[in-house]
């Protein structure tokens, strides 16, 4: 089974692997400052770990490649400015590096979710990575005018030992 992850160009994935936030102090933190209310890298990592143990070692992925429409041109820019990598979850699991998988449903599927709830995404722990849905994602629901770029589509967060997915578990797809 695969998940798809995007990283802005240029990047060092072929040499360093995919880094979680806990392993990437050079990450652009502007989004996380707003999201967490923290003012330092260390504070952001602590905030993530308060969400649940291992959260700072999480790496987001989609069950299929991202697709843009005329209503979601920001996704087109995102895709065109990034390298897409597939993550081999079977091998990660077989080698004991996959600690947990969480599912973030579309906000459309969570009627009790309030718009002002912006502290962290809703994450539901899956029993096993084989519980990842293989149903097609409805990318047409993404709309730049509504904001929340990926809130309308389901995605996954894999918690990885050490916070790094080594290069041998990933394939550059574009």
For each feature predicted by the language model, list its residue ranges.
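Active-site and NAD+-binding cores of ADP-ribose-processing enzymes
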Residues: 83-174
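Short low-polarity hydrophobic stretches
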Residues: 4-5, 64, 173
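Short, flexible beta-strand-to-coil junctions
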Residues: 1, 6-13, 71-72, 87-93, ...
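A short, exposed loop/beta-hairpin motif centered on an aromatic-Gly-Thr core
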Residues: 57-67
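Short, isolated positions within intrinsically disordered regulatory regions of eukaryotic proteins
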Residues: 35-36, 45, 51, 72, ...
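ADP-ribose/NAD+-binding catalytic cleft of ART/PARP-like enzymes
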Residues: 1-59
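Short active-site loop/helix that positions an aromatic residue
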Residues: 68-83
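A broad, low-specificity signal marking well-ordered, structured residues that form hydrophobic/aromatic
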Residues: 2, 66, 83-85
């Amino acid at each position: 089974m695969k998940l798809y992850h995007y990283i802005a160009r240029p990047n060092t994935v072929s040499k360093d692997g995919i880094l979680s936030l806990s392993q990437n102090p050079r990450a652009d933190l502007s989004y996380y400052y707003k999201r967490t209310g923290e003012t330092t890298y260390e504070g952001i990592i602590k905030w993530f770990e308060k969400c649940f143990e291992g959260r700072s070692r999480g790496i987001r992925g989609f069950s299929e490649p991202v697709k843009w429409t005329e209503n979601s041109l920001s996704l087109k820019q995102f895709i065109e400015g990034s390298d897409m990598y597939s993550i081999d979850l079977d091998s990660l699991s077989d080698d004991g590096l996959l600690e947990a998988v969480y599912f973030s449903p579309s906000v459309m599927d969570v009627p009790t979710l309030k718009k002002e709830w912006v502290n962290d995404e809703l994450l539901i722990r899956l029993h096993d990575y084989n519980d990842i849905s293989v149903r097609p994602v409805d990318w047409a629901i993404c709309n730049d005018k509504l904001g929340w770029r990926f809130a309308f589509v389901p995605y996954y967060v894999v918690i990885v030992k050490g916070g790094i997915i080594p290069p041998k578990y990933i394939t550059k797809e574009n």
